[in-house]
Amino acid sequence: MAVLTHGSPTPSGAYFDGKGINFTLFSAHAEQVTLCLFDEQGQERQIAMPARTGDIWHGYLPGGKPGQRYGYRVSGPFDPSRGHRFNPHKLLIDPRARALEGKVGDDPRFTGGVSQPDVRDSAAALPKCLVIHEEYDWQGDKPPAIPWGNTVVYEAHVRGLTQLHPDIPPELRGTYAALAHPALIEHLKTLGITTLELLPVQFHIDEPRLQKMGLSNYWGYNVLAPFAVDPDYASGREGISPLRELRDAVKALHNAGIEVILDVVFNHSAELDVFGPTLCQRGIDNASYYWLTPDGEYDNITGCGNALRLSHPYVTQWVIDCLNYWRDSCHVDGFRFDLGTVLGRTPAFDQHAPLFAALAADERLSACKLIAEPWDIGLGGYQLGNFPTGFSEWNDQYRDAMRGFWLRGEVPRGTFAQHFAASSRLFEQRGRLPSASINQITAHDGFTLLDLLCFNQKHNQMNGEENRDGSDNNHSNNFGCEGLVADAAIWQRRKACQRALLTTLLLSQGTPMLLAGDEQGHSQQGNNNAYCQNNILTWLDWGSADRALMTFTADLIRLRQQIPALTQDQWWQSGDSNVQWLDSQGQALSDAAWEQGCQQQLQILLSQRWLVLINATDHECEMHLPEGEWEGIPPFGVSDHAERLTTWRGSAHTICVLIKRD
């Protein structure tokens, strides 16, 4: 019969030392913690944790080996008004579990009880934690260490990017292994992508509401076990674990000079609101892990039912340990933080919040690329520009300004220029670098680039919420016809804007982020909230990809890397050689000219050699070029754009780049 010795309060989690397993669990308010061991048949053995050091409960299992299945039961007060929801009838996941076996279904046994504890035992329905100890030969792997000034981010979903790729073997499509396939890596290299940002690959579950409708949480933001690799994206090949497969992918991408950033979710947990399932933190120490109101209710500043209390000392350390685990075990190069304002809540947002301080103090993590989504839905939740040094931030003001300028004619060129210059008013005055602005026209959340030009209204009926979900503020323009079916004249205008927006994104100062599929002309049929669509709506259709647009995008990225004003990651100053702002006559824009309403024509001279010509009007225009001899460069040809070396005639919604002859 298994017996636990006292063991040690460190290391955290379930750790195999070669002779046995040391188990630890944090709970400040528990009265008893019970370790539950399971055999292959699911038979359970319960053993009380024999020791407590501070708020860490611990025990050591002599002879325990990797592959051991386990969970916890935690006893204590059930007093919701004080934030306590202990219930020993509920088996609980270790918040530090590095692997899980099984799935979470829509099972009533997970209900923990709203006003009184639910006595149905949940062990048979809950996935079991697995102790793992996997050695791996990285074969000298080193991080690509791409400078921020050269970084081009490509946001992608493991399955969506690879599920329909014809050159990847069918058994590998939609998996981590597909990311390592030469065909996928060749696409990224041909495009010029430096940094692949993956939507969550942490172990996530599908909300009960989606399961009832036959849908799933495709994006993966409903995370249950943040230390564990999600097995849903593993190929299941014999002898190759999900962790190894992800490691293989990172190693292959690194060998190709491509960084890997993980989108991580620490703002909320998969336990949802008070009516949600009791699976982990709620039953372990609800009052420590979650932000609660004075009467014990969940403070739902995320819109997901709960919010993790990341300013609590232990919860702060839990996040730091998790990030270091991913960095050390998978060699990832950085992290994008979903609803990042929660990271700094104390409960008000604070640049000096404990988690920010811990990140800055950690030499390994502070050297990573850290990207924040700088908002949540709580009071004071919008914090664009306010994150501490070391973070870059998703810039929705850039997105809306560029959409409004090109598609709606409602943004003046002064506003356009300010955001083209890495939103300098937001970041420069706060001591941040241009790379702090993660520029985007589109992201996973919202319309794709093509849909932005084909739909004025969202079409989210497939999501099962009667089209209520998703944003109604899209700044889109269908050019007179809703949908993908339109006449040639409308498509001509759409394609012109498609190229104009891509050019603007990839030639703006700051860090560009390209949504996977935008370079191919991918459409989601007007669905701007496809979080639950694990199907051909979200999977890239490589067979019908716009090859000309892919070439255009690759040429733009190559062009970007040639322009010092865009790669040196230094602020442009008035009168320096980085930028000159010119009017349609090739003359420097005066202060008065900047203020002239919604002028939609502009010339931008970068590094004294590359001239960006912009006509965002709905009619043709002629521009006089500044002094010098100019010629077109890929993807812009002289024959297409320049009538002669002194003028340029631009069609409606057109952008062009010329280079000055030596």
From Swiss-Prot:
Keywords of the record, alphabetical order, are: Carbohydrate metabolism, Glycogen metabolism, Glycosidase, Hydrolase
The entry's protein name is Glycogen debranching enzyme
GO biological process terms, alphabetically, are: glycogen catabolic process
Protein's UniProt keywords contain Hydrolase: yes
Supply the source organism for this entry. Answer: Yersinia pseudotuberculosis serotype IB (strain PB1/+)
Family, as annotated? Belongs to the glycosyl hydrolase 13 family.
SUPFAM superfamilies linked: (Trans)glycosidases, E set domains, Glycosyl hydrolase domain
Where does the record place the catalytic residues?
338, 373
- Give a yes or no for keyword Transferase in this entry: no
**Catalytic reaction(s) noted:** Hydrolysis of (1->6)-alpha-D-glucosidic linkages to branches with degrees of polymerization of three or four glucose residues in limit dextrin
| Gene Ontology MF terms in the entry | glycogen debranching enzyme activity; hydrolase activity, hydrolyzing O-glycosyl compounds
* Role description: Removes maltotriose and maltotetraose chains that are attached by 1,6-alpha-linkage to the limit dextrin main chain, generating a debranched limit dextrin.
- PANTHER family listed in its UniProt record: GLYCOGEN DEBRANCHING ENZYME
Q: What class of enzyme is it?
A: hydrolase
Q: Where are the residues marked Transition state stabilizer as a site?
A: 445
Q: What is its EC number?
A: 3.2.1.196
Pathway recorded for this protein: Glycan degradation; glycogen degradation
The record, for CDD domains, names: AmyAc_Glg_debranch, E_set_GDE_Isoamylase_N
